Structures are given as C-alpha cells and as structure tokens.
C-alpha cells in the first residue's frame, strides 16, 4: 500500500512564511528556510512552498529562495506561485524543486499543463485548486485564482477532471472556506474530487486536531494532508501526528 503523506505548507509573502484565515489577515510565521529545515528534520514526508503574492503581483517566484530551501532539505519539495511558462518551470526545477504547482496560470492557459507535463513528466506537475463552496449549495464549489481573490465561475469537479486529462500528476486541493480555521478539512469536497480522478489528492485547509487528519485520509480519501497553522503554531508536532496515525494502523512513514 502506498504510504499516506504529511506535508507542511510554507506560504510565503515578501520572503517570510505567513498564515491567515480564509486567505486573509496574514500573520508572520517565520523564515522559510528555517521552517523547511525544521519540518524536514521532524519527519515531514514532503514540503510545499507557495509564494502566495506572486500571482497577485504578477512576478515570478524567487528562484534564489527556492534554491536555498531545496539545498537545506532532503525530502521532495514542491514550489508554486506566479509560474506561467515552461521556462519558469525549468528554472525552478533546476534550482532544486522536485515539483511545481500551477494554479492561476493553468486556468488562464490550460495548454501550459499539457506542455509542461510532456516536457518534464507528469510527476513534476501539481495543479493547485482553490475551491470555495457556492452560496446555498452543499455539493458545488467554484475555482478561485489570484490567491483566492478572483472567482472564475469554473466548477471544481469539472476542472479537476480536466487537469487530469491535460496531464497533471497530482492535485493540491484547498478549501478556502476551511483555510486557517483549524475546524477540520472539507471532507465532502475532498472525497468528491478524489472519487472522480485517478490522481493523488492533497487535502488542504482546516486541520485543527489529530482526528481531522485521520478523517481526511479515511473519509476524505486524500493521499496526503497539507498542514500549516497547526504546525506553525506548534499546536501539534509531526511526531505526535504520525504516532497517532500509526496507532490507527494507517500506512504512514514513521519518524526516524
């Protein structure tokens, strides 16, 4: 059985790790390289580094920061934010990233997904989907871009299926409604996407306790759980989380 993954997320703005609630009210959570090293040493399976201001400010993710971070860790590393060309993807992979995450640029230019998948292999291409539940709808979500500031009107489930057809290797699915709240993942959203694609789905947005993480693997059918506030605030450690999940007989890589 393929091991389930725990993935700390480093949201970066202006060179610092930040975290907010529902994509707003950002607060400083530390230096990205220091946090990357800490989580790598503590037993993270992978890392995700997202420059959350890049798409808004129309600038590329800082390759230097990616390089310094990647050189400091020994685990797979995904980088995203403002990546809008095959050349940019090449630069980031050469700088040390194992994968790249495409979001706004994939919606704007779907051909970028297929081109980059052919060029670098679909294992390198992660599609990030920022999903928000439609008002008064229990099972319909829309895709947001530009750091969660712009509603595309695109149905999340349709888009997930489309990016799979285009050649994506993985989906990073964020519930904007749950982001930073620590009230639990959106299990209905996660399961709905996981059920219609044959791709690993990384669940993001809302982890607040050990049971939330267990639930997103069992009920949400996620292949990986993204963790941010829970770890940055030191509410739980990766060792505590992994010990809990291993006791529940889930296929998790133990901390060394």
From Swiss-Prot:
Function: IGPS catalyzes the conversion of PRFAR and glutamine to IGP, AICAR and glutamate. The HisF subunit catalyzes the cyclization activity that produces IGP and AICAR from PRFAR using the ammonia provided by the HisH subunit.
Sequence intervals crossing the membrane: none
Protein name from the UniProt record: Imidazole glycerol phosphate synthase subunit HisF
Lyase in keyword set: yes
GO CC annotation: cytoplasm
Keyword Transferase: no
Reactions catalysed according to its record: 5-[(5-phospho-1-deoxy-D-ribulos-1-ylimino)methylamino]-1-(5-phospho-beta-D-ribosyl)imidazole-4-carboxamide + L-glutamine = D-erythro-1-(imidazol-4-yl)glycerol 3-phosphate + 5-amino-1-(5-phospho-beta-D-ribosyl)imidazole-4-carboxamide + L-glutamate + H(+)
NCBIfam families: hisF
GO molecular function, one term: lyase activity
Xref: Gene3D superfamilies: Aldolase class I (3.20.20.70)
Pathway: Amino-acid biosynthesis; L-histidine biosynthesis; L-histidine from 5-phospho-alpha-D-ribose 1-diphosphate: step 5/9
UniProt superkingdom: Bacteria
Organism: Prochlorococcus marinus (strain MIT 9301)
């Amino acid at each position: 059985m393929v091991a389930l993954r725990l993935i700390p997320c480093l949201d970066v703005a202006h060179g610092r790790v930040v975290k907010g609630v529902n994509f707003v009210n950002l607060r400083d959570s530390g230096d990205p390289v220091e946090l990357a090293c800490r989580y790598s040493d503590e037993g993270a399976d992978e890392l995700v580094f997202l420059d959350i201001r890049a798409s808004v400010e129309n600038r590329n993710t800082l390759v230097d920061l990616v390089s310094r971070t990647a050189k400091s860790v020994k685990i797979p590393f995904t980088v995203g934010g403002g990546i809008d060309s095959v050349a940019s993807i090449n630069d980031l992979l050469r700088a040390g990233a194992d994968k790249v995450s495409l979001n706004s640029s994939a919606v704007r230019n779907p051909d970028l997904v297929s081109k980059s998948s052919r060029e670098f292999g679909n294992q390198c291409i992660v599609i990030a989907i920022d999903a928000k539940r439609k008002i008064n709808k229990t099972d319909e979500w829309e895709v947001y871009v530009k750091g969660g500031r712009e509603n595309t009107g695109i149905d999340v489930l349709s888009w997930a299926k489309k990016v799979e057809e285009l050649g994506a290797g993985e989906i990073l699915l964020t519930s904007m409604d749950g982001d930073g709240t620590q009230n639990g993942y959106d299990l209905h959203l996660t399961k709905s996407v996981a059920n219609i694609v044959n791709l690993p789905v990384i669940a993001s947005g809302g982890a607040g306790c050990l049971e939330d993480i267990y639930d997103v693997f069992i009920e949400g059918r996620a292949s990986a759980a993204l963790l941010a506030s829970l770890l940055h605030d030191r509410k739980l450690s990766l060792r505590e989380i992994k010990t809990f999940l291993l006791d529940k007989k889930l296929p998790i890589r133990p901390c060394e």
